[in-house]
Amino acid sequence: MAPSYKLTYCPVKALGEPIRFLLSYGEKDFEDYRFQEGDWPNLKPSMPFGKTPVLEIDGKQTHQSVAISRYLGKQFGLSGKDDWENLEIDMIVDTISDFRAAIANYHYDADENSKQKKWDPLKKETIPYYTKKFDEVVKANGGYLAAGKLTWADFYFVAILDYLNHMAKEDLVANQPNLKALREKVLGLPAIKAWVAKRPPTDL
């Protein structure tokens, strides 16, 4: 019997979208529960460590976006062929998480003075550094982020790209031809194209 899936997350793409991409690619039906802000106080105590996204698999709760994505990648043939390739995938996904954290450090800063000071280093140093490096990695891997083939790392990156772009206030791959081609490649997959066409529209 096929497992049942229920994703619990707020009504945005962000860290829930890699999971939605992977479930769609795996042609799995899933309940996409998007709670509203007012629902969170009652929902939070039932979530592991009080955070989302949470993916229930046959009623069993799993959490942490990267861990869930890694699991789904294995389920759907998107992991490495050996430990070395899986290390390559994990390294690049962890680096994507570092990049996200650097942008989020600016975006979520509630102190406007502090936020202003972070803007120039982010735009002139951090973003160009990471996007150039990622572009070089994709070029060296034959058009992919790791292992020279399509893996869950590619889905993870493309799925959170709208979120990263929203926080950074720019299209991060616009001037990086290999990253841009990777985005088009993933979004062009029939299952992903179908998901993107039917998902609720959100900015991030």
Curated annotation (Swiss-Prot):
PROSITE patterns in the cross-refs: GST_CTER, GST_NTER
EC numbers, comma separated: 2.5.1.18
Domain GST C-terminal: 82-204
Reaction catalysed by this enzyme: RX + glutathione = an S-substituted glutathione + a halide anion + H(+)
Keywords assigned by UniProt, alphabetized: Allergen, Transferase
GO MF entry, a single one: glutathione transferase activity
CDD domains: GST_C_Sigma_like (cd03192), GST_N_Sigma_like (cd03039)
Residue stretches making up the GST N-terminal domain: 3-80
Family as reported in the entry's similarity comment: Belongs to the GST superfamily. Sigma family.
The protein's name: Glutathione S-transferase
